[in-house]
Curated annotation (Swiss-Prot):
The gene is apbE. Flavin transferase that catalyzes the transfer of the FMN moiety of FAD and its covalent binding to the hydroxyl group of a threonine residue in a target flavoprotein. Displays FAD pyrophosphatase activity in vitro, hydrolyzing FAD into FMN and AMP. It comes from Treponema pallidum (strain Nichols). Magnesium. Can also use manganese. Its cofactor is Mg(2+); Mn(2+). The keyword Cell inner membrane applies. This is FAD:protein FMN transferase. It is a lipid-anchor. Keywords: Cell inner membrane, Cell membrane, FAD, Flavoprotein, Lipoprotein, Magnesium, Membrane, Metal-binding, Palmitate, Signal, Transferase. It holds the Pfam family ApbE.
């Protein structure tokens, strides 16, 4: 398995010209797609636009430059990241941090409080013992895991914003040996930044996919070969948690919405016939045992969808419903082990079942 610090540029900008130039003076829509391995995962951005190709090229270049820069800030798996430097100062004085890191930590601690710790950005000490998704993943020694959990209290993370313009923001990890790990929220945070960047370039039709964290911006175009291409909602697939992932079990139609799914199938290892997945329960320190196979969150902000997907998977169905009532405009789709599917009111009519083994309850 490869470390998330790998930078491998797998492709240059692919521009699919579906109608060259203009037709009768009308600019036609062009589809642009770019993919790279960065932030430890495959990141894809697809854009539809009538704007000059050079402008779209420039915007996509900015997107992937942003991702490369932010990996140097937010990665828990790079020794040279800003987050690693902060973790190294745990138990000492406050540390001046990058404003993007500070903003992300603010939101992460908000969701930690709201979820009662089911989402916990300070779980790094325990996560490192498991090392799931990397080389040498292993079941930790029980005593070592118990000790690590004593260093996972998110309430020991203290933020202080600069009170004047230009004043530094600081973060203090009050307990020695504690470690932040933002893997359950960072991709959502970066997806939001990408959407802001695309919008600033007057690009209003795009699909951002950061390792399965989706943001569907605006409406897509249908047949881009037509000068009057139809605008359609994006169809986002939800996989069978026990399938190969090659074909979706469900499809949900969305626009201006992030879709993030958490499930036990994403990263795991097996020992002695037992599967250990990567979503750790902060109470037990072990992979979460829950009554759902996967949870998909639909939200206007990908940061929120990312954090809530993890929290809801750990909490299970009933407690998740209680939590989500505090977030108007956020919807959820739950897949249960018996292949029942429950979706909240805001999206249930947008769900199409493609695999007849799954039953959408209404």
């Amino acid at each position: 398995m490869k470390s998330s610090c790998v930078y491998w540029r797998i492709g240059v900008l692919v521009c699919i010209l579906c109608g060259v130039g203009s037709c009768g003076g009308r600019a036609r829509v062009r589809e642009y797609s770019r993919a790279e391995l960065v932030i430890g995962t495959l990141c894809r951005v697809r854009v539809y636009s009538k704007r000059p190709a050079a402008e779209v090229h420039a915007a996509l270049e900015e997107v992937f430059t942003l991702l490369q820069q932010q990996e140097m800030v937010l990665s828990a798996n790079r020794d040279d990241s800003a987050l690693a430097a902060l973790n190294a100062q745990a138990g000492s004085a406050p540390v001046v941090v990058d404003r993007s890191l500070y903003a992300l930590l603010e939101r992460a601690l908000f969701f930690a409080e709201k979820s009662g710790g089911a989402f916990n950005p300070a779980l790094g000490a325990x996560v490192k013992l498991w090392n799931i998704g990397f080389d040498r993943a292993a079941v930790p020694d029980p005593d070592a895991l118990k000790e690590a959990l004593t260093r996972c209290d998110f309430r020991q993370v203290h933020l202080r914003a600069g009170v004047s313009v230009g004043a530094p923001h600081t973060v203090q990890l009050a307990q020695a040996g504690m470690q932040l790990d933002l893997g359950a929220i960072a991709k959502g945070f970066l997806a939001d930044k990408i959407v802001q960047l695309l919008t600033a370039h007057a690009l209003d039709s795009a699909l951002v996919d950061l390792g399965g964290n989706i943001f569907a911006l605006g409406l897509k175009y249908g047949d881009v070969r037509s000068a009057a291409a139809q605008r359609l909602e994006w169809n986002v697939g939800i996989r069978d948690p026990h399938g190969t992932g090659q074909k979706p079990a469900l499809v949900v139609s969305v626009r201006d919405c992030s879709v993030v799914t958490s499930g036990a199938y994403e990263r795991f290892f097996e020992r002695d016939g037992v599967r250990y997945h990567h979503i750790i329960d902060p109470v037990t320190g072990f992979p979460a045992h829950t009554d759902v196979d996967s949870v998909s969150i639909f939200a206007p902000r990908s940061t929120d969808a990312d954090a809530l997907a993890t929290a809801c998977f750990v909490l299970g169905y009933e407690k998740s419903c209680a939590l989500l009532r505090e977030f108007p405009g956020v919807d959820a789709l739950f897949i249960f082990p018996d292949k029942r599917v429950r979706a909240s009111a805001g999206i249930v009519d947008r769900v199409r079942v493609l695999d007849a083994r799954f039953v959408l309850e209404r």
